[in-house]
Each structure stands twice: as C-alpha cells, then as structure tokens.
Amino acid sequence: MFMKDAGMNGFKTEQRDGMCIDWDVPIRMDDGLELRADVFRPPGEGRHPVILTCGPYGKGLAFQDGFGFAYNKLVTDFPEVAAGTSQKYQCWETVDPEKWVPEGYVCVRVDSRGAGRSPGFMDLFSPREVRDIYHAIEWAAVQGWSTGKVGLCGISYYAMNQWLVASLQPPHLTAMCAWEGAADSYREWSRHGGILCT
C-alpha cells in the first residue's frame, strides 16, 4: 500500500486493493463552500468515464456497518453481490468501486452539504443540493483522470436526486441509472392523490 500525505491539495492519496484512492477531495461550489469527495480510480495514467453519487448517508460509512440488517439480507439472498469484492468500500445504495474501477471507471462519492465530511446546512432535495450535484458533475468532467463523460448511478435517494439534477441539464451528464427513485416526489412520495402522507 502506498500513501501520499495531504499536501497542497488538502487530501490524501493511496494505492490500495488495486485502486488509486483520493480521500476527502475538496470540490468548490459556486458559493465557495467545499464539499468532500472520495475518488476511486484505476492506477496509473489515463482518462476514464466517471460514475458519481452525491448524498447524505456518509461516503465513508460501509454498507455493513451502517445498515447491517439490510446488508446481511442482501448478501444472503444474493451472494453474487459480495463475490469478487472485499465490501470495504461498498456504501448504502451506491456502486461498489471494487467492481467498477477494474472495468475502467472512476467512482466519485460526494457527501452532500452538511452530511458526512462536507460542511454546511443539510437541506435534502433542495435547489441548493441539486446545484451542488450539478457542480460536482462538472468538476468531475474536467479532472485529469476523466474523459468528460459523467454518469450517475444509485438507489432511492441517489436515484431521486438524479432526476432533479438532470432537469438542470449539466453539459457533461451523459448517463443515469436511477433505481427505485421517485421522479415526482410530490405525487409519488409525500402526497399520494394530493393528500399528505405521514
């Protein structure tokens, strides 16, 4: 394992488990606040397509640690999910970098404003959060390791925010894989038939 200490960029980089991992990379938003991201990429030089997620669950919280019951049920019912991966980097409802990085993708996992390692006030599904995801997409597109093609992939919360940010039409958003995500949270989530669901 090789680790480079945080330097001028303010984040640490290490080679681990066949990946180059950048921890707590700052991504500056249009209002000056810096969100934090973990970037998992193939080792060596080269440009790769990006799979990005941004959400409130904590980018560094392992699936099995934060959601043990759901994790155990998933790997019991579908053992192929855990095959070929240590599951150390698998987080709730996001892609597992140990499966995607060997296929030539960069996985960028961003903590939403006010969540995990990102400062600020958490305001779920707000216009501010949606703009933050837009800026994270555009940031990822221009990094030296990126082809400029950024896709979004995730379940539930990570799917719903895909629909919201897509409405802003980020120039470098080229793909979405939204699983189990309401496209209209008013009708599908909070007010079925116009009646508040509690």
Residues covered by each model-derived region:
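N-terminal cap/lid segment of alpha/beta-hydrolase-fold proteins
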Residues: 7-46, 50
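Mature extracytoplasmic enzyme cores
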Residues: 23-24, 28, 36, 107-109, ...
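Loop/turn elements at helix/coil->beta-strand transitions in domains of secreted/extracellular proteins
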Residues: 34, 47-49, 103-106, 146-149, ...
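N-terminal cap/lid subdomain of alpha/beta-hydrolase-fold enzymes
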Residues: 38-105, 110-113, 124, 167
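A catalytic-pocket lid/entrance helix-loop region that shapes and gates access to the active site
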Residues: 73-76, 128, 153, 160-198
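Alpha/beta-hydrolase active-site loop
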Residues: 91-92, 102, 124-144
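Alpha/beta-hydrolase fold nucleophile elbow
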Residues: 144-157
